[in-house]
């Protein structure tokens, strides 16, 4: 039996308060499926979804989910299902889930799927228990199927950072891995600038010695080049005057 989600009290955030700001360059552009009738517009919506979920401005071709893109272009799935598929993809699992703790996975997922930061530590603990009991896939389903997601984004809107006021965008303050994984990567490679690193590098080099097999000259058999047969035929003189007449 799955453990129910623990209760937590929401804290005050900008997205919970109605805003009256004048739209400017910081206002996020909202991508809706009903506003994308042409091929170029649906492509912009797809790339907006990639940027939101993967938090990268350049998406590698290797990370693209071609099957999901095709289904969305043919209107066989909604944007909400497309977001669900991106969050459950193998690329997201390898880039984000495997490189972070459950608490940081909760923070990243709330920012990229629900468009807001965690309310408090209690919410992070509650969702981390959800990951431990139902797995990351069950956690994604709980976010995408939540009432909060439905109210703010519905079925055909790409999630975005809600009511960003003065703060930097989430993709600039929340890289795909934290300090723990960064320090682990630093420990696994050599850092330039310290002479001790060169000494450690030299010690880590394994020199493969070549084993030579000693050879005794007494054991080398020299082939016999003497002739045992007598040459046959008419002998020819090597004197040119005997072979060629002189004029």
Curated annotation (Swiss-Prot):
Database matches in InterPro entries: PBS_linker_dom, PBS_linker_sf, Phycobilisome
Keywords: Antenna complex, Membrane, Photosynthesis, Phycobilisome, Thylakoid
GO cellular component, one term: plasma membrane-derived thylakoid membrane
Segments traversing the membrane: none
Domain PBS-linker residue range list: 11-189
Membrane topology summary: Peripheral membrane protein
Organism superkingdom: Bacteria
Gene Ontology biological-process entries: photosynthesis
Pfam family, one: PBS_linker_poly
Record carries keyword Thylakoid: yes
Presence of keyword Thylakoid: yes
Compartmental location: Cellular thylakoid membrane
Assembly and oligomerization: The phycobilisome is a hemidiscoidal structure that is composed of two distinct substructures: a core complex and a number of rods radiating from the core.
Cited PANTHER family: PHYCOBILISOME 32.1 KDA LINKER POLYPEPTIDE, PHYCOCYANIN-ASSOCIATED, ROD 2-RELATED
Family: Belongs to the phycobilisome linker protein family.
Function: Rod-core linker protein required for attachment of phycocyanin to allophycocyanin in cores of phycobilisomes.
Protein name: Phycobilisome rod-core linker polypeptide CpcG2
Organism of origin: Mastigocladus laminosus
Name of encoding gene: cpcG2
């Amino acid at each position: 039996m799955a453990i129910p989600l623990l209760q937590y009290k929401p804290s005050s955030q900008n997205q919970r308060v109605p805003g009256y700001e004048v739209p400017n360059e910081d206002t996020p552009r909202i991508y809706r499926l009903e506003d994308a009738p042409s091929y170029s517009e649906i492509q912009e919506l797809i790339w907006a979804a990639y940027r939101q979920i993967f938090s990268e401005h350049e998406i590698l071709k290797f990370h693209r989910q071609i099957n999901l893109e095709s289904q969305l272009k043919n209107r066989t799935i909604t944007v909400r299902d497309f977001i669900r598929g991106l969050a459950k993809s193998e690329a997201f699992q390898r880039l984000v889930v495997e490189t972070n703790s459950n608490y940081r996975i909760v923070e990243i997922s709330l920012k990229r799927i629900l468009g807001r930061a965690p309310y408090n530590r209690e919410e992070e603990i509650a969702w981390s228990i959800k990951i431990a009991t139902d797995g990351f896939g069950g956690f994604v389903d709980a976010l995408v199927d939540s009432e909060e997601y439905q109210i703010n984004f519905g079925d055909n809107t790409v999630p975005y950072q809600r009511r960003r006021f003065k703060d930097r965008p989430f993709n600039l303050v929340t890289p795909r891995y934290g300090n723990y994984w960064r320090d682990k990567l630093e420990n696994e490679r050599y850092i330039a600038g310290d002479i001790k690193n060169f000494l450690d590098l030299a010690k880590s080099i394994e020199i493969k010695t070549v084993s030579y097999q000693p050879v005794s000259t007494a054991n080398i058999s020299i082939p016999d080049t003497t002739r045992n047969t007598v040459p046959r035929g008419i002998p020819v003189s090597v004197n040119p005057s005997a072979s060629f007449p002189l004029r």
